[in-house]
Amino acid sequence: MGKLFGTDGVRGVANKELTCELAFDLGRAGAYVLTEMHKKPKILIGKDTRISCDMLEAALCAGLTSVGADVYLAGVVTTPAIAYLVKSHGFDAGIMISASHNPYEFNGIKFFNSQGFKLSDQIEEKIEDIILNKKWDEVPHAQFDAIGRVNRVDLKKDYQEYLKSTLNGASFKGLKIVIDCANGAAYKIAPEVFEELGAEVVVINNQPDGTNINKECGSTHLKMLQQEVVKNRADFGIAYDGDADRTLFVDEEGNIVDGDKIMLLLAQNLKQQGRLSRNTLIVTVMSNMGLFVAAKELGIELEVTKVGDRYVLEKMLEGGYSIGGEQSGHIILLDFATTGDGILTSLQLTKLIRESGKKLSDLAKIMKVYPQVLVNAKVENGKKDLYSKDPVILEAIKKVEEKLNGKGRVLIRPSGTEPLIRVMIEGEDYEEIKKDAEALASLIESRLS
């Protein structure tokens, strides 16, 4: 992982860290690196609903076309839609402008290769090298008759039809579902798909205004969805984040069903159908201890990776596994998609719920959740790795681990996308671990500020 590209593309505060100039440079360098593989690359661009997306899109277009690439603008679509459409429509690369679940002032630029996978580290490093070391002499401007063109395309329907095709004719008639679109990229795509499948849909947070994406809504703020599910007497609720690469559910009683439970239910279903590749589910270190206990009882093997869907995907591709994901609702179903797809995941789980004939609250009993507390310590990006060398912080962590005595764990993890260090503690006594997590986060902030 380099200086520009984080775990999920290039990300930062729009017009401050992620500027037009940087977007233009990413377009130029990206198109040049891709022209080494394709004479005149065709590049598909999508965006979420942030106010800064139009600005960054224009800068990217200028950079890409100046090197001779042809650009196709898909408008507001989800990140997984770009990944799917790049491959299905024969584009040479895709770019998504989004900062996913982050607040609206952030934005990001994420590249996909022609197969719909995120760019390899090697290609990201080539792009980075040109920009950071100002190797613009290597990047020629296109001859005036070879400048790229910008085209607008509407491919949403193709993606929606593909999503429905993964369900083998299932109908959601008779189901009442509340969908929280996070005022983000799924605000039209998701409700339309569920309605076309026969569900009665109550939609919330589907009025994006450029500044309300993820604001007190979506998969990172589930309170409104919980209330609406109970109020509307719905069968369950579904929440997406800003670019719909993740999803979480709420059962009919208003309880949260997180990514751990969702992927365990889907893995168990695949196992019953004989489709769980190598009988294994890929999870991250953030998954709850309850998942490990339940998987063992169900006879499902687990492989554990670092946090970040790119690490989950790497492990899946390496071992030929079919399902993996994160507690946050980032779930990859490799039989159908090359990246985490919130709408796809929610359709598959809805099909499972419908076919089981059970309530989601009953299905969610598949695992017992151990109390888990996550507290964020605000630390500048450049100082995030220093915690592991600070003797005072290390001693404090050791003391908490001794107190847990094998019946819990402490996980300290710098965020790959934000200026934060995440402190996660799991144990049997919620109040106790909450106190310890807050104390550790506070110590980290004071030591590294």
Swiss-Prot record:
Q: Which HAMAP family match?
A: GlmM_B (MF_01554_B)
- What cellular component GO annotations does this protein have? cytosol
* Enzyme Commission number: 5.4.2.10
Phosphoserine is found on 100
- Signal peptide range: none
General function of this protein = Catalyzes the conversion of glucosamine-6-phosphate to glucosamine-1-phosphate.
Positions that bind Mg(2+) = 100, 241, 243, 245
Q: Which Pfam families match?
A: PGM_PMM_I (PF02878), PGM_PMM_II (PF02879), PGM_PMM_III (PF02880), PGM_PMM_IV (PF00408)
Instruction: Please identify the protein, giving its name as recorded.
Output: Phosphoglucosamine mutase
Task: Spell out the post-translational modification annotation for this entry.
Answer: Activated by phosphorylation.
| Family (UniProt) | Belongs to the phosphohexose mutase family.
